[in-house]
């Protein structure tokens, strides 16, 4: 088994307790009700300007620890103050040291400070329930 197969098997196993049938209508309804303040594509499409997606990542399978113990909200604050156009938040725990709570916390921070930086959940997406989780986080 190669590394990607190992990661995907681990991800499926970790989701066993939350998996339930998801209807397309449920995803569509959530998508309509959770539109971001500024669309992701719009945030990255300023003409004549380099767009930056800043990543919140503690470790990776290939590099090991990158920023062990990093506070996701503090890192988001640094990136936001540096005018990142969007944030990518790793939510995989086992291989990247993140969590879905990191996404919730960063989105809450941005809303509390009236910032409109779009956030992307970066994970191994193997089931539609993960899309719902990301949308619920904002």
Language-model regions, residue ranges each:
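Residues forming well-ordered secondary-structure scaffolds
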Residues: 98-101, 105, 126-129, 137
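Arg/Lys-rich RNA-binding interfaces used to dock onto structured RNA substrates
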Residues: 57-61, 70-71, 88-94, 98-106
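Short, conserved beta-strand segments within well-ordered enzyme catalytic domains
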Residues: 51-55, 86-88, 118
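Alpha-helix-loop-beta-strand connector modules within alpha/beta enzyme cores
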Residues: 35-42, 47-48, 97-120
């Amino acid at each position: 088994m190669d590394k990607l197969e190992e990661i995907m098997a681990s991800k499926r196993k970790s989701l066993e307790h939350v998996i339930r049938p998801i209807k397309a209508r449920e995803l569509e309804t959530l998508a309509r009700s959770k539109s971001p303040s500024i669309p992701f594509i719009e945030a990255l499409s300023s003409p004549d300007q380099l767009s930056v997606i800043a990543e919140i990542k503690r470790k990776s399978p290939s590099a090991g620890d990158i920023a062990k113990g990093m506070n996701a909200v503090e890192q988001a604050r640094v990136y936001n103050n540096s005018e990142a156009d969007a944030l990518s938040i790793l939510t995989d725990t086992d291989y990247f040291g993140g969590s879905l709570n990191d996404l919730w916390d960063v989105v809450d921070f941005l809303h509390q400070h009236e910032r409109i930086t779009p956030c992307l959940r970066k994970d191994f997406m193997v089931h539609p329930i993960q899309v719902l989780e990301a949308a619920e986080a904002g």
